[in-house]
A protein has these predicted regions:
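Generic long, charged, amphipathic alpha-helical segments
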Residues: 286-322
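Conformationally flexible catalytic loops at phosphate/diphosphate-handling active centers
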Residues: 164-268
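Glycine-/acidic-rich phosphate or pyrophosphate-binding loops and their flanking alpha/beta elements
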Residues: 7-11, 257-277, 290
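Thiamine diphosphate
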Residues: 1-127, 134, 151, 170, ...
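Conserved thiamine diphosphate
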Residues: 116-170, 194-195
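Peripheral docking tails and interdomain loops at the edges
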Residues: 328, 334-375
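Short helix-loop-beta junction
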Residues: 40-45, 251-259, 291-306, 349-351
Length: 375
């Protein structure tokens, strides 16, 4: 392990470089701009390319173009910028172009409070586009995870050939401190790169794969010809209105993610064995939860356990159902008006308790303890 001092946004950039990202296209927006700035410094030093575009739409567009050339690529923004990127997010999903999209969440809606924290993009990124969509979204909760979840985001994007969201709230992005991260050799060993077709060019059908597998898009300029389209398409990418081909395509885009959910989903569980109450939280809120439980579990007769999904989408619905069936008192805590609460209650098929706020401020351990005493 290496010990460094950094903030969350710069750790995202460091992880991206070390896992092989060599292109960043974007447009500055608070509170994600530090990622962009760090990439502008680091990429030229390692043979990569950085470009600040005229707006958020062109920022994601050039990143997709770079990815189609075979280069690991990313962009970063916050809620208002992500709203502008949604057309190309849909294109990335449909054409199976891998891309990491960092969303450092700030208070909204609209322009909201640019320098304040929120978790208001959670439901938005579950389904940001028109048409059907299967999201992959990771939620770092610490400086260490700002690094490790970025590595995981790139690996999942390359493995699944799909856009992957790094859904990080402002507090994690701007917290600063000493952190231990994996050695570069460890990162290189765990790095996943997209598959390439090796064979006769006339046999190359990038979208002609099994129903639980992603497309195999060879990088441009290697002599393999295919068509890239946001339209429904057949095995070599040319548009079609055939009902079976179109239906099979959408089924495959879903199933390639659903079939890998055991790999995609990661959770943290604490003190669930004898718990009478279970708290569910994610992102920076989990830090306040852990601080609150240090004292509460020593003083209270009611033991409190903690469940944290690191992967928000696809949701850990099966595990949530198990928790809902086993524990009577469940408290969901979020920096919004109950966005992930909706998914938790859907998975558990029951109502649970909630503590949330959308005022640009963090939830304190004192607020959490006060809520626990009400249950």
């Amino acid at each position: 392990m290496r010990e460094i001092i950094s903030d969350g946004n710069e750790l995202v950039a460091k992880a991206a470089i070390e896992v092989g990202c060599r292109f960043f296209g974007g447009y500055p927006i608070t509170p994600s701009s530090d990622i962009m700035h760090a990439m502008s410094v680091a990429l030229p030093k390692c043979g990569g390319h950085f470009i600040q575009m005229e707006d958020e739409i062109s920022g994601i567009s050039v990143s997709l173009g770079a990815s189609m050339s075979g280069t690991k690529s990313m962009t970063a923004s916050s809620g208002p910028g992500i709203s502008l990127k949604v057309e190309q997010i849909g294109y990335s999903f449909m054409a199976e172009i891998p891309l990491v999209i960092a969303d450092v969440m700030r208070s909204g809606p609209s322009t909201g409070m640019p320098t304040r924290v929120a978790q208001g993009d959670v439901n938005f990124l579950k389904h940001p586009i028109h048409g059907d969509f299967k999201a992959v979204a990771l939620a770092p909760a610490s400086l260490e995870e700002a690094y490790t979840e970025t590595v995981r985001a790139f690996n999942l994007a390359e493995m699944l050939m799909t856009p992957v969201f790094l859904l990080m709230d402002e507090t994690v992005g701007h917290m600063y401190g000493k952190v231990q991260i994996p050695n570069l050799e460890e990162v290189q060993k765990m790095t996943i790169n997209r598959k390439e077709f090796v064979g006769d060019k006339k046999d190359y059908k990038p979208y002609g794969v099994a129903q639980d597998e992603p497309a195999v898009l060879n990088p441009f300029f290697k002599g393999y010809r295919y068509h890239v389209s946001g339209l429904h398409h057949g095995p070599i990418g040319f548009p079609t209105e055939d009902a079976k081909i179109g239906g099979d395509l959408i089924d495959r885009l879903f199933h390639k993610i659903e079939s890998k959910q055991d790999i995609i989903n990661e959770n943290e569980e604490m003190d669930l064995e004898d718990a009478e109450i279970v708290i569910i939280a994610y992102g920076s809120v989990s830090l306040a939860v852990k601080e609150a439980l240090k004292d509460y579990n020593k003083e209270s007769k009611q033991k409190v356990g903690f469940f944290r999904p690191k992967t928000l989408w696809p949701s850990p619905a099966k595990r949530l159902k198990e928790i809902g069936d086993k524990y009577e008192k469940i408290l969901v805590i979020e920096l919004n008006k109950g966005q992930y609460l909706e998914e938790i209650e859907r998975a558990m098929q029951r109502k649970v308790h909630f503590l949330g706020q959308a005022n640009g401020r963090t939830i304190s351990p004192k607020q959490i303890i006060a809520k626990l005493k009400e249950l």
